Regions:
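Charged, alpha-helix-forming regions
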Residues: 1-225
Length: 226
């Protein structure tokens, strides 16, 4: 791992998440450890994300937004981006076993971890979130594909999140539910049928024995965290 070129996670109060990636995480079953790793990635690239935010100039006109191809021109012949994350940022209270963190890294290399739009076939392709994970007693290292970075840097529509949220939640569904409900934040009240909620969260219809069990096993646990 070339540390001079690697993105390093930073201590921040908030991170930015693109709407594209938010939509992916809503339908993805991620563990709390995976969510912490994702937050570390977002903390490392926040300056890069700001380059893609469409800013309104003083004259009322919107400044020309940087394109991803222009940004990536400086990374010629490099299809992968390196990341370096201190273990004590993922496991600050040292309550997790290192083996659990390593298992989460391996899980995130799964080809089916997420699906991205593939314009070349007018469809989707399954891709891992990270590649080539490695670790020692102080750091974890991995790489992100250019296609993943493009998804994370698409700031046409984005949201702000507390970076330490996965450190404070007791269940992994809390972040998932929060990301889902973010799109309704400008609406005072939202009414959804039980089946529609399951569909939007990509939860199998037979996962719970009716809305009562969903409320008991999913919503009530999320409410405790929020």
């Amino acid at each position: 791992m070339n540390s001079d070129k690697a993105f390093v996670s930073k201590i921040r109060k908030k991170v930015l998440i693109s709407n594209d990636f938010r939509e992916i995480l809503i339908t993805q079953n991620t563990s709390i450890i995976e969510q912490r790793i994702i937050m570390m990635v977002l903390s490392a690239i926040k300056e890069q994300q700001s380059l893609f935010i469409n800013v309104k100039a003083f004259n009322g006109k919107r400044e020309i937004q940087l394109s991803f191809n222009d940004y990536y021109e400086g990374w010629a012949n490099q299809g992968l981006v390196e990341f370096s994350i201190p273990l004590n940022q993922i496991n600050p209270k040292q309550m997790m076993k290192n083996s659990a963190i390593q298992e989460a890294l391996i899980q995130m290399t799964n080809l089916n971890w997420l699906r991205l739009k593939d314009e070349t076939i007018n469809g989707f392709k399954a891709v891992p979130f990270i590649l080539e994970p490695s670790w020692n007693s102080k750091y974890i290292y991995f790489k992100l594909d250019k296609a993943i970075m493009k998804n994370l840097l698409n700031m046409n529509h984005y949201f702000s999140l507390l970076k330490d949220l996965p450190n404070k939640t007791s269940v992994s569904n809390t972040l998932r539910f929060l990301l889902w409900i973010l799109k309704f934040k400008k609406i005072k009240q939202v009414t959804k049928e039980y089946g529609q909620i399951l569909k939007e969260l990509n939860i199998p219809s037979n996962k719970y024995e009716g809305s009562y069990r969903f409320d008991r096993d999913f919503l009530k646990r999320v409410k405790v965290d929020l």
